[in-house]
């Protein structure tokens, strides 16, 4: 086996940060849509937004354009850890199974994607909790990233920073286990078929396809994960929140219907599409650098 290659880690992190900055307002509207309408939390019971565009306009009008980037600092911190580990681990694990990219199979890529998703998301979970908490705030964020981080730690302890970690790992296993293999297989077949070469157009089409596949597979888990992470330690006895991820799933389905699990799907897909396009196009261009 060849020595561990550092390039996928660095390139993956840089490409992930670039993609995050380019699509963050869409991600914020997704979070706001997913946390609204919760009958067991008075703060988020009201249906404030009718959809993604309405959320973008209303947030910008009522809270200012700066609010569309609420939580960008922990999001970039998350991608610098999660994105770096995810891409680097995925590429490294593949080389453990096969030496040449041409010998990769769908099964190998899925296994490597699932493992890299679980590992990277578990390590980066505190930054994910922080990002969602800051995105959910509908007023000026107080204390900044460090202040919010300390607030979560002081009120909820270490467990608060890893709240929803099992669901985050499950979601990452689904997303990474779908997106990265779909990208690789789509790109491989487009090139081998002779329809397209190894060009930016191939990278564009492959990344768009994997974004759609990832959104369809992950949205229900994403809704539950977002609600679990946004749930605070409540003092009101009538507002007990969710006892666990399964309880959150069942309550959401029972109180709001099955399609509540696909709340935020359009901003989720419209984010994952451009996000993956920016990610993979940037990553492929970085790979061409002679370093």
Swiss-Prot record:
Subcellular location: Mitochondrion inner membrane
Keyword Chaperone: no
Catalytic reaction annotation: sulfite(in) + sulfate(out) = sulfite(out) + sulfate(in); thiosulfate(in) + sulfate(out) = thiosulfate(out) + sulfate(in); sulfate(out) + phosphate(in) = sulfate(in) + phosphate(out); oxalate(in) + sulfate(out) = oxalate(out) + sulfate(in)
Keyword Metal-binding among record annotations: no
GO CC annotations, alphabetized: mitochondrial inner membrane
SUPFAM superfamilies: Mitochondrial carrier
Sorted UniProt keywords: Acetylation, Membrane, Mitochondrion, Mitochondrion inner membrane, Repeat, Transmembrane, Transmembrane helix, Transport
One term of GO molecular function: solute:inorganic anion antiporter activity
Main location: mitochondrion
Membrane topology classification: Multi-pass membrane protein
Protein family (similarity comment): Belongs to the mitochondrial carrier (TC 2.A.29) family.
Quaternary state and interactors: Interacts with VDAC1.
Function of the molecule: Antiporter that transports inorganic anions (sulfate, sulfite, thiosulfate and phosphate) and, to a lesser extent, a variety of dicarboxylates (e.g. malonate, malate and citramalate) and, even more so, aspartate. The sulfate/sulfate exchange is much higher than the phosphate/phosphate and malate/malate exchanges. The transport affinities is higher for sulfate and thiosulfate than for any other substrate. May catalyze the export of sulfite and thiosulfate (the hydrogen sulfide degradation products) from the mitochondria, thereby modulating the level of the hydrogen sulfide.
Protein name: Kidney mitochondrial carrier protein 1
Organism, as annotated: Macaca fascicularis (Crab-eating macaque)
Source taxonomy: Eukaryota, Metazoa, Chordata, Craniata, Vertebrata
């Amino acid at each position: 086996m060849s020595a561990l290659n550092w390039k996928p880690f660095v390139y993956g992190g840089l490409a992930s940060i670039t993609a995050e900055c380019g699509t963050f307002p869409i991600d914020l509207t997704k979070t706001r849509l997913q946390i609204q309408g919760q009958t067991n939390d008075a703060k988020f019971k009201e249906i404030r937004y009718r959809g993604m565009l309405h959320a973008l306009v209303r947030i910008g009008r009522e809270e200012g354009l700066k609010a569309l980037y609420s939580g960008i600092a922990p999001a970039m911190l998350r991608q610098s850890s999660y994105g770096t580990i995810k891409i680097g681990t995925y590429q490294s694990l593949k080389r453990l199974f096969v030496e040449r990219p041409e010998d990769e199979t769908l099964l190998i890529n899925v296994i490597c994607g699932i493992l890299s998703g679980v590992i990277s998301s578990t390590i980066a979970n505190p930054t994910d909790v922080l990002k969602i908490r800051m995105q959910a705030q509908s007023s000026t964020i107080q204390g900044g990233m460090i202040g919010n981080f300390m607030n979560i730690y002081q009120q909820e302890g270490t467990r608060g920073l890893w709240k929803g970690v099992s669901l985050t790992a499950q979601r990452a296993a689904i997303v990474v286990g779908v997106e990265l293999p779909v990208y690789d297989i789509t790109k491989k077949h487009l090139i081998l078929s002779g329809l397209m070469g190894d060009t930016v157009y191939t990278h564009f089409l492959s990344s768009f396809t994997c974004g759609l596949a990832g959104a369809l597979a992950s949205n229900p888990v994403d809704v539950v994960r977002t609600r679990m992470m946004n749930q605070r330690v409540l003092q009101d006895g009538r507002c007990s929140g969710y006892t666990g991820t399964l309880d959150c799933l069942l309550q959401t389905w029972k109180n709001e219907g099955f399609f509540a699990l696909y709340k935020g799907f359009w901003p989720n897909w419209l984010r994952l599409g451009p996000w993956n396009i920016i990610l993979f196009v940037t990553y492929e261009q970085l790979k061409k650098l002679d370093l």
